[in-house]
A protein has these predicted regions:
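Short, low-complexity, Pro/Ser/Thr/Gly-rich segments in the mature regions of secreted, periplasmic
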Residues: 140-149
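C-terminal motif of bacterial Sec signal peptides marking the signal peptidase cleavage site
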Residues: 8-11
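Bacterial Sec signal peptide processing site at the extreme N-terminus
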Residues: 13-24
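Structural signal for glycine-centered tight turns and loop->strand junctions in beta-sheet-rich domains
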Residues: 61-67
Length: 149
């Protein structure tokens, strides 16, 4: 009876038992290395091929794990200023994760869980790395965003 009690006691721990230990370990390492660098406001802009339009993205990643993403299309005005002709704003929560791709390889992502009417939508954005100045992600058509000072 003592042996049964000891076995039950030892098998119950507060340590997580992930379904995929290697992905869990990679995710912990990813967060330790990059999480504190992620917080802040990031943006980039890109002229379209015809030069008459410009795509702009602004991503704000907050420490409470909320985000605001603004994707805009601008056109030049008569006075030389760019004017927004289309703007899409999304908000929700974000996290750094590691998932398995179709080839069973580990894939680091920035996961954006967007609040929408009637529910939420998850968006997996490939994550490469981040430093104090540049966030390298695959947020089409951008491959990097620069920190806003």
């Amino acid at each position: 009876m003592l042996l049964t009690a000891m076995t039950l006691f030892c098998s119950c721990s507060n340590e997580p038992h992930p379904a995929d230990p290697s992905a869990y370990k990679a995710q912990q390492e990813l967060r330790e290395k990059y999480l504190n660098l992620m917080y802040g406001e990031w943006q980039n802009e890109m002229p379209r091929e015809d030069g008459q339009l410009k795509s702009v993205v602004n991503l704000k990643l907050n420490e409470d794990r909320t985000f605001t993403l603004v994707e805009s299309t601008l056109t030049p005005g008569n006075n030389g200023e760019w004017t927004s002709i289309h703007e899409y704003t999304s908000e929700g929560t974000w996290s750094l994760r590691v998932v398995r791709d179709d080839n069973d390889e580990l894939r680091p992502i920035l996961y954006l869980k967007e609040r929408q009417e009637g529910g939420t939508v998850g968006r997996m954005v490939d994550f490469l790395n981040v430093d104090n100045d540049v966030l390298h992600i695959d947020l089409y058509p951008f491959s990097e965003l620069k920190r806003v000072e």
